[in-house]
């Protein structure tokens, strides 16, 4: 894990932004100022991608997908490549995490080879367990309860259009699903308001 810690610090220095916390399992892991800082950084990256082309230089990122994906997989692979890193895909659709070997063993092995792990899973508990046993950053790219990357993208859209998130009121219409849960957390963190309109018995978790 020493190599990973060193690379993690180098990436933070290159970005000019501390990469904390260690894991991103849900938006609730981030406070408001950190979210705004990430959004500002994303705008800088979009404006001058060459400046960030080696932020992940020398790093290998594991991508674990228990569920089918087009946009998430493509954006992660292309994004990691454009930042100078190397992505390795593990397609787990036919053999879910923990079925062939324990999550403990999986995490202990991945931390020896990779600088970070991004996982798209059916059960959020798998991410919690993976983060417990894997001594490199774990990123939730979708679970049954949370979708933090989608919320950061949604908030970035509002932020880019000049909206002050703390003064914004977002309406969510649909099932109270993983996207809804994360957006609620995000709006609370930045000090905004949110109204959820869902079918009866299909609202967000309490």
Identify the residue ranges that each predicted region occupies.
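N-terminal polybasic/positive-inside topogenic patches
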Residues: 5-7
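Phosphate/diphosphate ligand-binding glycine-rich loop within oxidoreductases
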Residues: 54-159
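Generic structural "secondary-structure junction" signal
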Residues: 26-32, 58, 98-99, 140-141, ...
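N-terminal acidic, proline/glycine-rich, low-complexity intrinsically disordered segments
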Residues: 1-3
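Glycine-rich phosphate/diphosphate-binding loop of Rossmann-like nucleotide-binding domains
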Residues: 66-78, 161-206
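Glycine- and other small-residue-rich loops at beta-strand/loop junctions that grip anionic moieties
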Residues: 27, 65, 119-120, 143, ...
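Positively charged, low-complexity intrinsically disordered leader regions
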Residues: 11-74, 78, 146
């Amino acid at each position: 894990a020493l190599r990973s810690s060193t690379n993690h610090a180098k990436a933070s220095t290159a970005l000019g932004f501390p990469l904390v916390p260690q894991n991103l399992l849900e938006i609730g892991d981030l406070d408001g100022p950190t979210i705004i800082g990430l959004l500002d950084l994303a705008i800088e990256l979009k404006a001058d991608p060459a400046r960030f082309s080696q932020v992940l230089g020398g790093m290998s990122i594991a991508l674990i997908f228990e569920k089918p994906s087009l946009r998430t997989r493509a954006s992660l692979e292309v994004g990691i490549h454009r930042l100078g890193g190397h992505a390795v895909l593990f397609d787990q659709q036919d053999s879910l995490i923990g079925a062939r070997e324990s999550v403990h063993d999986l995490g202990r092995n991945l931390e020896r080879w990779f600088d970070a792990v991004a996982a798209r899973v059916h059960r959020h508990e798998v991410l919690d367990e993976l983060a417990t046993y894997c001594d490199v950053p774990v990123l939730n790219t979708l679970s049954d309860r949370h979708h933090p990357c989608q919320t950061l993208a949604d908030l970035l859209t509002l932020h880019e259009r000049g909206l002050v998130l703390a003064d914004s009121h977002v309406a969510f219409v649909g099932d109270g699903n993983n996207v809804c849960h994360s957006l609620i957390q995000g709006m609370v963190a930045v000090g905004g308001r949110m109204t959820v309109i869902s079918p009866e018995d299909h609202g967000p978790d309490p």
